[in-house]
Curated annotation (Swiss-Prot):
This is Histone PARylation factor 1. The active site is at 284 (proton donor). Keywords: Acetylation, ADP-ribosylation, Chromosome, DNA damage, DNA repair, Nucleus. It comes from Mus musculus (Mouse). GO terms for cellular component: chromatin; nucleus; site of DNA damage. The modification ADP-ribosyltyrosine is found at residue 238.
Amino acid sequence: MVGGGGKRRTAGAGPQCEKTVEVKKSKFSEADVSSDLRKEVENLYKLSLPEDFYHFWKFCEELDPEKPADALATSLGLRLVGPYDILAGKHKMKKKPTGLNCNLHWRFYYDPPEFQTIIIGDNKTQYHMGYFRDSPDELPVYVGTNEAKKNCIIIQNGDNVFAAIKLFLMKKLKEVTDRKKISILKNIDEKLTEAARKLGYSLEQRTVKMRQRDKKVVTKTFHGAGLVVPVDKNDVGYRELPETDADLKRICKAVVDAASDEERLKAFAPIQEMMTFVQFANDECDYGMGLELGMDLFCYGSHYFHKVAGQLLPLAYNLLKRDLFAKIIEDHLASRSEENIDQLAG
């Protein structure tokens, strides 16, 4: 069958006005962060940051005026990084002569271009939180968490940093038995909850905005965070892969486990076939198919798929006019690393 995989009929299919998220900014009072500093962060990352990003920085400044980025280090084991490093001025203290590449700064092994790390936790599991946005010209749709040493799964944790920290704190409170530690955590929880209430941020794990996005998700992908691509009223924009997720994982496993190059080439045949289907799909403006296959291969994690992912993903992102994501994935695949992801270290 030409095109491979049927078209998906989704309830949310229809012309998509993806700019609605911008409304959020006017809802809250602006955080007291200078426009120069805001411009510096957003110019370095080439991404707009939501107001909760700046509000949370001010909240941490109140907890620890000297080192806001470490305000939650002792109590929660969390540190503010990534774009927060720019607010802290860390990039100006950089010793390395090479320039800071924000596309790779705190980009963990499984982080897709849609994910922007803002907080790190336990180094053993590489726990981290980040903003997840469907397109580089939009504000984030939620805060996700991932443990890169375990897998590629991204878990949704509210639509702002306050909610993500609150959920982390609640989990921590269930684990801690020491009275003194419980008291410290409860104190932070009270301050956090009050700050979020004053500013009007929801502390829910799944908000109405997030549920609305769910209706636009065309496929979950291996990372589970879902992909959103424009699908018009004629259902043009996405078509399903001819293989289920389980089958695709089996195909990937066969490639990785192959005993010889010859076997590996044979095991690669179904992927080659799917790439042909993607070409048909791209010709018919179903750009989501190539994005899904490329993302799944990236998420599987093996270097055997880097070349194919490097062909599929930049093309898909460019066709979707998400050019920054194309650049991020190119940079990431060129130096994909499990360690040394702090661009400001040393």
